[in-house]
Swiss-Prot record:
Protein name: ATP synthase subunit beta
Gene designation: atpD
Source organism (scientific name): Mycobacterium sp. (strain JLS)
EC number(s) from the headed UniProt entry: 7.1.2.2
Residue numbers binding ATP: 167-174
Compartment(s) of residence: Cell membrane
InterPro entries noted in UniProt: AAA+_ATPase (IPR003593), ATP-synt_VA_C (IPR055190), ATP_synth_F1_bsu (IPR005722), ATPase_a/bsu_AS (IPR020003), ATPase_alpha/beta_chains (IPR050053), ATPase_F1/V1/A1_a/bsu_N (IPR004100), ATPase_F1/V1/A1_a/bsu_N_sf (IPR036121), ATPase_F1/V1/A1_a/bsu_nucl-bd (IPR000194)
Stretch list, region Disordered: 475-517
Alphabetical list of Pfam families matching this protein: ATP-synt_ab (PF00006), ATP-synt_ab_N (PF02874), ATP-synt_VA_C (PF22919)
Chief localisation class: membrane
Length: 517
């Protein structure tokens, strides 16, 4: 039995072509006249390489004319030669959906990686789907409470919205995504789908182990197309994961969280594919279809009536340049941005969120309420004033400031440290259990802090803790009491003592101590 005959039995189609050209992951296939497959159709080729037989999946990307189609391979093309039979499946790439995908790892083609053969009999959906119609969308705006102080207070997330974690390499984007998976599963019992797009294989394995240890793997489906995969796979893996999430939203009426790490790699893979297809590059070498490809993905991530897909996307910023077309194009689709800063990271404050650079469309009294909005704006005002004073402190020293500004600086430093929090994803490294702080307690704590009720407490007492109970416990362990001070204004003498004129690092001397706390 020939390979073409076997494929006919598997796919139910007799539309068979042959390979005429192979250039890396780009494969040109010739079909009989009048039988050219449609764009995005999946094609199968049976090949043998070094005594290993495998089925290669190709996706039709271009019609070249004269019954020729140009395809992108989803796997390495080692062993593929001219003349090999290629069968049109008559449909696009599809992936398994349903409750059975939870607790398992899949690739972009829907093959189970942790249990080969698993899921073959599942219902399958095409990865190329239309977004919900306008009249199906949920008009209501609702906040998603995470239990992370800095997020809930200053950059509240939208249920059913799109949230981005911006940052350069090594500032904690993946750790924060792992933290959110833990929190959603433990605190809300929600379904999560994770898309590993072009990131390190080691990180995928670590995530698998951590989710299993935290007993949340049973509520999570993982789809990986890591950085060693061909660009076609890296470009499609986000769509495969999104399709699984859409099933839970549309068929099971569930709220779903979709995590994408890293959306920049999706753009990068699209750029590689565009170059391979011979398209003229656009700005900074990116593909001319960048905005279109991003829109096709992002428009499917939305809330329909009564259920939602909330997406959290890590965005690598090349060379920390936010004007780069990849992160700039992503901005247009977002409801909230959480920027992870290298300067905050260097102070040992985790999560390393820059509260002044991060934003949310729902930080508005009509959504979060007057009290939340007032406290958030006061915290931002104090931190912004502290930032404005940095140059003066660096040149003249803190002693040259007015008394009111000295007090504000000390208060801002306490706010900075109180925005840090011990995280569940870091328990094995810190030895401290992760903390979840209710929104009401977060607002109350920062309201008191911004009014000066805690000015008498040492800065280190605010570092990497949860709520007010943790603050009281840590302050008492350092010999201070919560009710010893008030808002009378005088900053603790130890904070400004010996900070002389011209000391360029006067306001950051506590940072090293924080790291050791």
């Amino acid at each position: 039995m020939t390979a073409a005959t076997e494929q006919k039995e598997k796919t139910g189609t007799d539309n068979v072509g042959r390979v005429v050209r192979v250039t890396g992951p780009v494969v040109d296939v010739e079909f009989p006249r009048g039988s050219v497959p449609e764009l995005f159709n999946a094609l199968h080729a049976e090949i043998s390489y070094k005594d290993l037989a495998k089925t290669l999946t190709l996706e039709v990307a271009q019609h070249l004319g004269d019954s020729l189609v140009r395809c992108i391979s989803m796997q390495p093309t080692d062993g593929l030669v001219r003349g090999v039979d290629v069968t049109d499946t008559g449909a696009s790439i599809s992936v398994p959906v349903g409750e059975g995908v939870k607790g398992h790892v899949f690739n972009a083609l829907g093959a189970c990686l942790d249990d080969p053969g698993y899921g073959k009999d599942f219902e399958k959906w095409s990865i190329h789907r239309k977004p919900p119609a306008f009249d199906e969308l949920e008009p209501r705006t609702e906040m998603l409470e995470t239990g992370l102080k800095v997020v809930d207070l200053l950059t509240p997330y939208v249920r059913g919205g799109k949230i981005a974690l911006f940052g350069g390499a090594g500032v904690g984007k993946t750790v924060l995504i792992q933290e959110m998976i833990n929190r959603i599963a433990r605190n809300f019992g929600g379904t999560s789908v994770f898309a590993g797009v072009g990131e390190r294989t080691r990180e995928g394995n670590d995530l698998w182990v951590e989710l299993a240890d935290a007993n949340v793997l049973k509520d999570t489906a993982l789809v990986f197309g890591q950085m060693d995969e061909p660009p076609g796979t890296r470009m499609r893996v986000a769509l495969s994961a999104l399709t699984m999430a859409e099933y839970f939203r549309d068929e099971k009426q569930q709220d779903v969280l979709l995590f994408i790490d890293n959306i920049f790699r999706f753009t990068q893979a699209g750029s590689e594919v565009s170059t391979l297809l011979g398209r003229m590059p656009s700005a900074v070498g990116y593909q001319p279809t960048l905005a279109d490809e991003m829109g096709e993905l992002q428009e499917r991530i939305t809330s329909t009536r009564g259920r939602s897909i909330t997406s959290m996307q890590a965005v690598y910023v090349p060379a920390d340049d936010y004007t780069d077309p990849a992160p700039a194009t992503t901005f247009a689709h977002l409801d909230a941005t959480t920027e992870l800063s290298r300067s905050v990271f260097s102070k040992g404050i985790f999560p390393a969120v820059d509260p002044l650079a991060s934003s949310s469309t729902i930080l508005d009294p009509s959504v979060v309420g007057d009290e939340h909005y007032r406290v958030a704006q006061e915290v931002i005002r104090i931190l912004q004033r502290y930032k404005d004073l940095q140059d003066i402190i660096a040149i003249l020293g803190i002693d040259e400031l007015a008394e009111e500004d000295k007090q504000l600086v000390q208060r801002a430093r306490r706010i900075e440290r109180f925005l840090s929090q011990n995280m569940m994803a870091a328990e094995q490294f810190t030895g401290q259990p992760g903390s979840t702080v209710p929104l009401k307690e977060t607002i109350e704590a920062f309201d008191k802090l911004s009014k000066g009720d805690f000015d008498h407490l040492p800065e280190q007492a605010f570092f990497l803790i949860g709520g007010l109970e943790d603050l009281q416990r840590k302050a008492e362990s350092m010999g201070a009491k919560m009710d010893d001070g008030g808002s009378d204004g005088a900053p603790p003498p130890s904070d400004s003592k010996d900070k002389g004129k011209g000391d360029s690092k006067a306001d950051d001397k506590g940072d090293d101590a924080d790291k050791d706390a």
